[in-house]
Design a protein with these regions (language model features):
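Flavin-dependent oxidoreductase catalytic cores
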Residues: 1-338
């Protein structure tokens, strides 16, 4: 299986599995990541982990802490020869993720996205980043060596760094730079996930180029390119339709060619985009195909079939499932509550 440039890396991208018990990753979570952290995978990023004192996007989010459960999770990944990664995030008090795939709230959605940062003082912003710094220290102490800031999908960090939405974007960008410096000083890698567009025209049609300029100025090791805000249009976050997939890939590749000195992670069923002609600064992020099949890197014919069962929150469930998991050879561990 040729992936083009020898330096191209494969990432298992962040997903909120819901495999959580009392706010901590449970045995299902450990098994899930250990099963997928092999066969040449460079880094597995444990997804949607809430910073200390933060707010989860739903009730099935784990919060980083000094618990030994985090060390066990990181060890389970590293023992398979893969770099343990973790994605840190927070929403805000009163946040509710929508269960529909497309918002019917119209103009009210961007109003909320502007009101939340506007209601925060500079001290509030610094306090939020202090929690990120503390959470990053805890994650590194647990053994995670790749730390990702979740600044996408309409969660709090994505609002704070966006000048179109936040009066604190310059401050937030400076605080991200401090975070990158801290992670590098420990010997870790950093990445930032961001949304190329939100999916709401009243936001996307103004200031897009200035937003991108801020993002590419952040000195993270990798920029993980996503799209969409969760409470606007989830189809952009989880692209399935050919035109949406094409737009996501085209947008990522355009960025990579404009900024050849920056390392990008291409996501959005990007396992189907493996191509020796990809720019050398584009790495492959895989999510749904590896969710469906832990052995996907060895058996690429058995990946995601778009059954949509992984969208557990939208389906009113509390943890991740997959239609392919009915085959024991694909999922050799139980998915029932531990």
């Amino acid at each position: 299986m040729s992936l083009g440039a020898k330096s191209r890396k494969l990432f298992f991208l962040a997903v909120n599995t819901g495999f959580v018990e009392r706010g901590l990753p449970d045995r299902r979570c450990r098994d899930f990541y250990a099963e997928r952290s092999r066969s040449g995978l460079y880094c597995a990023i444990v997804g949607n982990v809430v910073i200390p004192g933060g707010v989860g996007s739903n009730d099935a989010c784990a919060e980083i802490s000094s618990s030994d459960a985090w060390r066990q999770l990181a060890e389970g990944i590293s023992e398979q020869g893969t770099l343990p990664g973790i994605q840190l995030t927070t929403a805000w008090r009163g946040y509710r993720g929508m269960k529909r795939f497309i918002s019917v709230a119209g103009a009210h959605v961007p109003q909320e996205y502007r009101q939340v940062p506007a209601s925060m003082s500079p001290l509030d912003v610094k306090t939020t980043f202090d929690a990120l710094y503390r959470g990053s220290e805890l994650a590194f102490q647990a053994g995670f060596r790749h730390l990702q800031l979740h600044a996408a999908h309409g969660y709090l960090f994505s609002l704070l760094v966006d000048r179109r939405l936040s009066p604190h974007s310059d401050l937030a960008a400076d605080l991200v730079r401090r975070w990158v410096h801290d992670v590098a000083s420990w010997g870790g890698e950093s990445s930032l996930r961001f949304s190329l567009w939100t999916g709401h025209p009243s936001i996307d049609k103004h200031g897009q180029s200035q937003f991108i300029e801020i993002i590419v100025s952040l000195p993270v090791d990798y920029l993980d390119v996503s799209a969409g805000f969760y409470n606007v249009d989830k189809r952009l976050i989880y692209p399935t339709l050919p035109d949406v997939l094409s737009s996501r890939r085209t947008g990522t590749l355009d960025l990579a060619r404009r900024y050849p000195h920056i390392q990008f992670i291409m996501s959005g069923k990007s396992s189907g985009a493996w191509d020796p002609s990809l720019p050398a600064n584009v790495h492959v992020g895989i999510c749904r195909d590896l969710i469906a099949n832990p052995n996907f890197l060895r058996d690429r014919d058995q990946g995601c079939n778009d059954c949509m069962k992984c969208h557990y929150f939208s389906r009113g469930q509390s943890y991740l499932t997959c239609g392919r998991w009915t085959y024991p050879r694909v999922l050799p561990f139980p998915v029932k509550q531990a």
